[in-house]
């Protein structure tokens, strides 16, 4: 049987692929989109580990588990090759270069209001398309980096997914710096970490996000634009039909939209963090908010509202910290001040706002800096101040902490405000505060009244009455500078010489009972005022004028009657009544005054004080009285207190003041000389400045800060020789004329120590005998003459720097009955008793008077005064006491140098002090000879060692 051969069927030849070059544009774009979609799907499966080779094991284990990126089988290799092919064909849409900003290549086209806007569904569809393009581009960038950089990029991405928290944050920050457009996922993760309660990583995450947003993501000169406001209808026109460009535009617009949402979430997260109890985290959040507000304009209303609301935080440190932050913002961006004022105004008049929020808000407003261009801003501030002021005063509260701050802010804004006098039509409430509140509130109130009256080209007599009456109150040390500045400005502008003389008399009365720094400042003020007003006005009266006619009449009456009777006579000898008007002219003058009052009342406008109103608080139109009236220290109106014929006996008391500088200043006024002092008396003559010299330490270097707070307490900066340590060689080598009067006894003492030290070293004597020239007994006697106090008072002085420690000899020395020396185990300095001695004369006025009377009866003091006069003539030839040029409360500065030191008025007190020490040395030397020439070191002198206590006999 023959088998038939079957014809072999040849396999059909595969059809040749249609070349892509022959495809149209639409087909090419569709093919690319399909390829990219499949590549994205493959890449997602590959990255998630959904592709497995062992299907049986996968079925047994159930859900797929992520595996390492190892192309173990041909299937995975084919997928990767296909993805690489697609990547090579299409490429990354956004190729960001480090150092450039993404908004530099952004297409900033917004929707035109004239054109019709797309509906919400169309906008959402385009937004989703842009998000898809953004996610796909981020995946392509990750694949490309792994191809180009290899193991380094793979390691970086593995750290982001599997590393520690710190390493993750660092790797994310690097990726966000490299390409912000492809890093929104990392920003979202960091914000989510900040939202977790109780996390300690917030303090580290916040600076990273702050850096990314400010330096890499947010535009500098514009806000972020949401997707809905873009020119979506013009998308085809903007891309010119190019699908790749169209996709890139959608990607960038969607990125900016998502970035705006994430930034707002970041700000809201910071606001929530402020409510947490951790102070460090709160301050870090507030600082970040302030930096974002200063650096970028995005979400400034939300940030500013959060900062202003922080004024009312339960922790008072947070409110104070917020004030500092807002001050920095206002300095860097002055244009934002009006926005800040509006936000604070909403806070100030909001219901249920605590007092602390008002306090910090007004503190910030009161420290703003203004110029002539800020008239509208100042008017807005004045309206806020006066509204709160009326609210507080309406409750009859005079000790409110908010009042001084409001008045201080009003004083700063008033000169720059336009038509500010109309805002302050009724000054009755301000006068109420000036009369019934403490100095902390009264001084700003009086300053505001002075500015108000000065703007109206006159100063009301009512203001002078209030200021004159306020001087009787005890002024605290913190208000010294404000009071002196107000007094100087007021007396400089006053046209009534008689009233200025009355104020000078009152200031001298205050100076007698004040601390040395305030007393010296008052004397300097009087000297400067005398120089400004000229020599024609006599501000200081040293002798009392007696009317010759009154002397004759009094002599005649004293001859007839045994009893003395005092009457006031004018130049012609007519008797004057108590109010200073002749009896026969009294009725006629009263009639004239009443007629003038009727005419003035017609001229005065209601609600405003006029310069011509003689019936109210302006009494200058009545005219000066032509007769001498007795000085009345309790009179209310300084205009009618005639102090021109009353001698300033206070200067005699001040010339014997225990503080050398005060004594010489007073003597300069008595001799009609100008007080030459350019330093800061309120700082240089304080008790602490005096005690700091005994501490023998150099002052701390004060770092000068620029661009800091507007209102800041000025740090004390010693000038001239006061900067030198009293134990240094540079200090002891200074001449006597170069040393301030209140330090000459220290200079003499330390100089003598240096000389004795050299002599003792040459002779080989003990070091503890260096203080032989001045013993504790001499200091006790000297202090007793200036400040006699209670016996058995103890005070500590640390002389360890000069004498060193010599413990072996302490037990060998015996105590003497004159001085009881107690050696302390430590070197702590206790100067409480010395403090009491310095303050004793200021606390007990009666005791001071007694001391001054004793000085008048002391013959040695009288001789010393004669010697002081001789020394004063020599001192005038040496030049002024110069030093560092520093402005004082009077607005001028001292331009002299250290070489010109020597002609200051207060040098005489130091000479007197040194001469008294010499007299005491001679007396002590005589006593030492009688006792057999004992060493003073063993009789209570200054030994080597730490702090020593000296008991007075």
Swiss-Prot record:
Database matches in InterPro entries: ARM-like (IPR011989), ARM-type_fold (IPR016024), CCAAT-binding_factor (IPR005612), CEBPZ/Mak21-like (IPR040155)
Compositionally biased spans, kind Acidic residues: 586-598, 817-879, 892-902
- Give start-end positions of Basic and acidic residues composition bias: 18-27, 798-808
Q: What's a GO cellular component annotated to this UniProt protein?
A: nucleus
Q: Where is the composition biased (Basic residues)?
A: 1-16, 927-937
Q: Any coiled-coil ranges, and where?
A: none
Q: Which Pfam families match?
A: CBF
Could you tell me which residues belong to the region Disordered? 1-27, 47-79, 580-615, 797-953
Name the source's superkingdom.
Eukaryota
Family per record: Belongs to the CBF/MAK21 family.
PANTHER family (alphabetical): CCAAT-BINDING FACTOR-RELATED, CCAAT_ENHANCER-BINDING PROTEIN ZETA
What name does UniProt use for this protein?
Uncharacterized protein F23B12.7
């Amino acid at each position: 049987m023959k088998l038939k051969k079957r014809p072999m069927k040849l396999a059909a030849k595969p059809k040749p692929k249609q070349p892509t070059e022959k495809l149209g544009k639409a087909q090419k774009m569709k093919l690319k989109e399909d390829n990219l979609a499949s590549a994205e799907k493959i890449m997602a499966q590959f990255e998630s580990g959904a592709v497995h080779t062992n299907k049986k094991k996968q079925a047994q284990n159930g859900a797929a588990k992520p595996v390492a990126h190892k192309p173990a089988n041909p299937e995975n290799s084919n997928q990767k090759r296909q993805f690489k092919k697609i990547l090579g064909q299409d490429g990354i849409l956004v190729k960001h270069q480090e150092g450039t900003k993404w908004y530099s290549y952004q297409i900033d086209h917004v929707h035109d209001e004239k054109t019709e806007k797309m509906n919400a569904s169309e906008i959402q569809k385009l937004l989703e398309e842009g998000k898809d393009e953004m996610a796909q581009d981020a995946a392509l960038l990750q694949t490309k980096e792994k191809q180009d950089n290899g193991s380094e990029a793979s390691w970086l991405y593995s750290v982001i997914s599997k590393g520690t928290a710190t390493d993750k944050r660092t790797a994310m920050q690097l990726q966000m710096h490299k390409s912000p457009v492809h890093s929104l996922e990392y920003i979202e993760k960091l914000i989510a970490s900040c939202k977790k309660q109780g996390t300690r990583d917030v303090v580290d995450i916040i600076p990273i996000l702050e850096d990314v947003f400010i330096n890499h993501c947010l535009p500098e000169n514009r806000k972020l634009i949401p997707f809905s406001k873009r020119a979506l209808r013009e998308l085809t026109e903007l891309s010119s039909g190019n699908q790749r460009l169209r996709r890139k535009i959608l990607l960038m617009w969607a990125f900016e939209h998502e970035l705006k949402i994430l930034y707002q979430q970041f700000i809201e997260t910071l606001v929530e963090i402020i409510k947490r109890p951790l102070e460090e985290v709160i301050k870090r959040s507030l600082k970040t908010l302030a930096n974002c507000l200063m650096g970028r304009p995005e979400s400034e209303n939300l940030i500013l509202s959060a900062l202003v609301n922080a004024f009312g935080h339960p922790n008072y440190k947070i409110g104070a910290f917020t004030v500092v932050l807002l001050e920095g913002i206002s300095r860097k961006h002055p244009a934002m001040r009006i926005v800040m004022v509006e936000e604070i105004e909403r806070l100030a008049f909001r219901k249920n706002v605590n007092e602390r929020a008002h306090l910090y808000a007004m503190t910030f407003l009161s420290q703003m800096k203004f110029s002539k261009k800020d008239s509208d801003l100042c008017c807005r501030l004045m309206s806020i101040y006066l509204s709160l002021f009326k609210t507080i005063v309406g409750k009859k509260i005079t000790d409110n902490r908010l009042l001084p701050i409001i008045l201080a802010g009003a004083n700063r804004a008033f000169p720059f405000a336009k038509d500010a006098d109309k805002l302050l039509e009724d000054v009755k409430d301000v006068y109420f505060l000036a009369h019934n509140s403490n100095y902390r509130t009264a001084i700003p109130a009086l300053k505001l009244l002075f500015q108000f009256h000065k703007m109206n080209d006159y100063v009301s007599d009512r203001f002078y009455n209030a200021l004159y009456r306020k001087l009787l109150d005890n002024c605290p040390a913190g208000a010294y500078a404000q009071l002196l500045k107000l007094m100087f400005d007021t007396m400089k502008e006053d046209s009534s010489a008689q009233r200025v003389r009355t104020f000078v008399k009152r200031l001298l009365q205050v100076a007698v009972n004040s601390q040395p720094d305030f007393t010296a400042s008052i004397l300097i003020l009087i000297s400067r005022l005398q120089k400004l007003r000229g020599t024609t006005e006599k501000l200081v009266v040293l002798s009392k004028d007696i009317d010759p006619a009154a002397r004759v009449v009094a002599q005649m009456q004293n001859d007839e009657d045994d009893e003395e009777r005092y009457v006031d006579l004018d130049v012609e000898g007519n008797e004057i009544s108590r109010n200073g008007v002749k009896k026969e002219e009294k009725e006629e003058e009263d009639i004239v005054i009443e007629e003038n009052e009727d005419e003035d009342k017609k001229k005065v406008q209601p609600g405003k004080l006029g310069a011509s109103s003689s019936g109210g608080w302006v009494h200058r139109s009545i005219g000066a009285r032509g007769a001498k009236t007795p000085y009345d220290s309790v009179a209310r109106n300084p205009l009618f207190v005639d102090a021109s014929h009353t001698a300033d006996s206070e200067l005699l008391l001040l010339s014997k003041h225990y503080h050398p500088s005060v004594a010489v200043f007073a003597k300069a006024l008595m001799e009609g000389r100008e007080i030459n002092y350019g330093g800061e008396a309120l700082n240089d003559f304080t008790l602490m400045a005096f005690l700091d010299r005994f501490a023998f330490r150099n002052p701390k270097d004060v770092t000068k800060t620029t661009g800091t707070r507007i209102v800041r307490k000025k740090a004390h900066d010693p000038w001239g020789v006061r900067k030198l340590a009293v134990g240094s060689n540079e200090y002891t080598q200074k001449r006597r004329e170069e040393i301030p009067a209140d330090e000459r006894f220290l200079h003499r003492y330390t100089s003598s120590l240096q000389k004795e030290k050299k002599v003792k070293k040459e002779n080989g004597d003990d070091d503890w005998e260096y203080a032989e020239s001045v013993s504790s007994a001499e200091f006790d006697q000297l202090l007793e003459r200036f400040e006699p106090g209670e016996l058995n008072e103890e005070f500590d002085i640390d002389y360890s720097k000069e004498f060193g420690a010599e413990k072996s000899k302490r037990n060998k020395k015996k105590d003497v009955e004159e001085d009881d020396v107690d050696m302390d185990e430590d070197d702590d300095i206790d100067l409480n008793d010395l403090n009491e001695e310095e303050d004793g004369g200021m606390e007990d006025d009666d005791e001071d008077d007694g001391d001054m009377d004793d000085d008048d009866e002391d013959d040695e003091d009288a001789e010393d005064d004669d010697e002081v006069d001789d020394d004063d003539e020599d001192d005038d030839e040496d030049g002024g006491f110069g030093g560092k040029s520093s402005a004082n409360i009077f607005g001028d500065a001292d331009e002299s140098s250290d070489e010109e030191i020597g002609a200051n008025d207060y040098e005489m007190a130091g000479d007197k002090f040194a001469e008294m020490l010499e007299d005491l040395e001679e007396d002590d030397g005589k006593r030492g000879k009688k006792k057999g020439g004992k060493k003073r070191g063993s009789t209570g002198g200054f030994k080597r060692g730490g702090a020593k206590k000296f008991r007075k006999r």
